[in-house]
Amino acid sequence: MWNYEKRLQYPVKISQTNPQAAQIIISQFGGPDGELAASMRYLSQRYTMPYKEVTGILTDIGTEELAHMEMICAIVYQLTKGLTPEEIKKYGFDKYYVDHTLALWPQAASGTPWTATYFQSKGDPITDLHEDLAAEQKARTTYDNILRMINDPEICDPIRFLRQREVVHYQRFGEALRITQDKLDSKNFYAFNPEFDMPKGCDC
């Protein structure tokens, strides 16, 4: 299904280590509104999305979120590569280091491990798409918060790219919701669950 290209979706070229920045950016790897949760959310939801166009949107965006997770991991890796024990202690990276050395491990900025409870796959297209719309806005806000904390242009450049993609994803999920609602009863979108209650094979 996937063709992997051996390059990042957007370049990440960071010349100076910064473990303090790494500790907050890692939240977009394994935090509640990060790229790992996003990719798992969309790639799980697509199986019970009754409309092919919307399934395609979920697949496209879920796949792109995997690429974004790779970018976040590259950023964190470059920010911590080659740190000395003295630097690790000085900048408060020691707690992470004890458990993971300098390996990538999904956690929030708070240190909370990634968990599948960060996302839902409900099997109702209206419910799932509203979750997706909210998820993209929460991710955008997180990137906004990161950009307020960091002023290194080498870090900010790929972060701004990722933030902009969240806006695009939000717009595409809005399109997916419109497609879904157009296929439902306009007087009551909630009259039935088109995934569970409609006859199998119906694309109406």
Where does each model-flagged region fall?
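Non-heme di-metal
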Residues: M1-C204
